[in-house]
Amino acid sequence: MAPSADPGMVRMALLLLPPLWLLPLTGGSQRAEPMFTAVTNSVLPPDYDSNPTQLNYGVAVTDVDHDGDFEIVVAGYTGPNLVLKYNRAQNRLVNIAVDERSSPYYALRDRQGNAIGVTACDIDGDGREEIYFLNTNNAFSGVATYTDKLFKFRNNRWEDILSDDVNVARGVASLFAGRSVACVDRTGSGRYSIYIANYAYGDVGPDALIEMDPEASDLSRGILALRDVAAEAGVSKYTAGRGVSVGPILSSSASDIFCDNENGPNFLFHNQGNGTFVDTAASAGVDDPHQHGRGVALADFNRDGKVDIVYGNWNGPHRLYLQMSAHGKVRFRDIASPKFSTPSPVRTVIAADFDNDQELEVFFNNIAYRSSSANRLFRVIRREHGDPLIEELNPGDALEPEGRGTGGVVTDFDGDGMLDLILSHGESMAQPLSVFRGNQGFSNNWLRVVPRTRFGAFARGAKVVLYTKKSGAHLRIIDGGSGYLCEMEPVAHFGLGRDEASSVEVTWPDGKMVSRSVASEEMNSVLEILYPQDEDKLQNTAPLECGQGFSQQDNGHCMDTNECIQFPFVCPRDKPVCVNTYGSYRCRTNKRCNRGYEPNEDGTACVAQVAFLGGYSSAAFRLSEPLSQASYLSLGLGLCLQLYAL
């Protein structure tokens, strides 16, 4: 006969268990409706010219032929690089970088290079994006046997400027093995630098930051001199670099840089406003030193106006870090659900609204490493005054359990307002590219915003906020590099469901801002926003509809309304404490808590302050890291006392 349990111990255990309604919702079972349908056979059928079966890696989206439409640039590892253009007459993607020396795109093929990372941006201010390929010939780390390529459209064709005499003499062409590359306008000039995440071997191969040297360049004569400014910018570090993403993460407008690394801590380079950076990853709680990062993306998942970070760890727990503020300092908190964080051999991570329902999805592109490993898809659903609900979705045809996923991008290449998904494969098996279209949300509203730099190029790193009539403010960053080895389209894509946009605001890396109304007839279209000229300041006082929770300020821009200072007072007597939030407010009771505890979001209970858990800072407490027995004991005892007090 089994011994009976002690009733007192059972009651104690029940007290220590949180109520079921306080447990985070994780979505339960996977949603049955498939999100994606494969259209590869009709849009990009495998063939020798446009979709060869080869090892491919990074993918980027830019306007290669300068005709106003996007092309998809693919980094070929065992074959040529590809430039895929959508042919509307044929309803197909066609490679325009053909194997003909007379073609202006011939050099982009670079058949000799083992390309892995790719990015595009305007480095010289001519209004046209250059294209950078990171090659890793014959090297996993340290020194490679073939240089990277930086292509510029010059003399009516694409040419590698790293091989120009001036740059050969300067020794700026990287011979180091690396992974991701990304574009950053570090000073707000409209001219971009290229951040190179090298894979160091000991003290060989630090990260690099390549940009134009204006004093040594003569653009009228076609001379574009380059320099590596990583050391002076404060980003020259030795690490096993993996993923890179760029945007105003900590800054209000200036571009910061997040790098998730392997065999070492991540970097969060905070732009100091003068083009130099300070690594704040540890203090912000995103250093994750014991994991091995891969794909990364930036987004505002809970629509609080702050930039959050999502990334995958190689066969480790994936992270979804919400940006918080504690005592005036930035902290990130991992809210990944158990299913979301489940380890996998992840490569690319993409955050986008694939069904235009207002909520962002996160796509994990895995590689079939040693065994099958299907791709995964999650919806991150905003909840008022609470952490987002994370719901697992059915990727449909994009499941690809045997896919050797290495890269991927989103773009709307056919102009229907729905994001298309392009995945690359390789490394352990040659596979063609895959193309997918969404199955859901065809009747939902959408808006696509394309900001331009002062020179007319895509304003990568710019922040776009769309104010709506019913659902508050939505934030996007114009991508300068993300995913893993990749760069998404330079568009702020907003899915709006049944809602409509009221106004849009663009903030450039130099702090310049433009706000304008969005008319009803402009819904379901593409808006281009030009860089503001000095005379545009006179137009900023035009009336704007900012939507619920926001109001137009004297400077002409929409800002959060502080309802807590309004008269009459907005909170009832039983919840007299008003807390202003982004686009809203909440009311809670005036609850007092013992030392080491603080009121929860609605003030109904006291919860332990993270700073008191075993000496861990409140930056980012992780249950995956061991606590001492004394810490667990003090935490459990404290919870008992607080529950008893209630």
UniProtKB/Swiss-Prot annotation:
<protein>
    <recommendedName>
        <fullName>Cartilage acidic protein 1</fullName>
    </recommendedName>
</protein>
<dbReference type="Pfam" id="PF07593">
    <property type="entry name" value="UnbV_ASPIC"/>
</dbReference>
<keyword id="KW-1015">Disulfide bond</keyword>
<dbReference type="GO" id="GO:0098978">
    <property type="term" value="C:glutamatergic synapse"/>
</dbReference>
<dbReference type="Pfam" id="PF07645">
    <property type="entry name" value="EGF_CA"/>
</dbReference>
<keyword id="KW-0272">Extracellular matrix</keyword>
<dbReference type="InterPro" id="IPR011519">
    <property type="entry name" value="UnbV_ASPIC"/>
</dbReference>
<feature type="domain" description="EGF-like">
    <location>
        <begin position="560"/>
        <end position="606"/>
    </location>
</feature>
<feature type="repeat" description="FG-GAP 3; atypical">
    <location>
        <begin position="284"/>
        <end position="334"/>
    </location>
</feature>
<feature type="disulfide bond">
    <location>
        <begin position="593"/>
        <end position="606"/>
    </location>
</feature>
<dbReference type="GO" id="GO:0005509">
    <property type="term" value="F:calcium ion binding"/>
</dbReference>
<dbReference type="InterPro" id="IPR013517">
    <property type="entry name" value="FG-GAP"/>
</dbReference>
<dbReference type="GO" id="GO:0051963">
    <property type="term" value="P:regulation of synapse assembly"/>
</dbReference>
<keyword id="KW-0732">Signal</keyword>
<dbReference type="GO" id="GO:0014069">
    <property type="term" value="C:postsynaptic density"/>
</dbReference>
<feature type="repeat" description="FG-GAP 1; atypical">
    <location>
        <begin position="47"/>
        <end position="89"/>
    </location>
</feature>
<dbReference type="InterPro" id="IPR027039">
    <property type="entry name" value="Crtac1"/>
</dbReference>
<feature type="signal peptide">
    <location>
        <begin position="1"/>
        <end position="28"/>
    </location>
</feature>
<dbReference type="InterPro" id="IPR028994">
    <property type="entry name" value="Integrin_alpha_N"/>
</dbReference>
<dbReference type="GO" id="GO:0007413">
    <property type="term" value="P:axonal fasciculation"/>
</dbReference>
<dbReference type="GO" id="GO:0021772">
    <property type="term" value="P:olfactory bulb development"/>
</dbReference>
<dbReference type="Pfam" id="PF13517">
    <property type="entry name" value="FG-GAP_3"/>
</dbReference>
<dbReference type="InterPro" id="IPR049883">
    <property type="entry name" value="NOTCH1_EGF-like"/>
</dbReference>
<dbReference type="InterPro" id="IPR018097">
    <property type="entry name" value="EGF_Ca-bd_CS"/>
</dbReference>
<dbReference type="GO" id="GO:0030426">
    <property type="term" value="C:growth cone"/>
</dbReference>
<feature type="repeat" description="FG-GAP 2; atypical">
    <location>
        <begin position="106"/>
        <end position="148"/>
    </location>
</feature>
<keyword id="KW-0964">Secreted</keyword>
<dbReference type="InterPro" id="IPR001881">
    <property type="entry name" value="EGF-like_Ca-bd_dom"/>
</dbReference>
<feature type="disulfide bond">
    <location>
        <begin position="571"/>
        <end position="587"/>
    </location>
</feature>
<keyword id="KW-0677">Repeat</keyword>
<feature type="repeat" description="FG-GAP 4; atypical">
    <location>
        <begin position="396"/>
        <end position="438"/>
    </location>
</feature>
<feature type="disulfide bond">
    <location>
        <begin position="564"/>
        <end position="578"/>
    </location>
</feature>
<keyword id="KW-0245">EGF-like domain</keyword>
<dbReference type="GO" id="GO:0005576">
    <property type="term" value="C:extracellular region"/>
</dbReference>
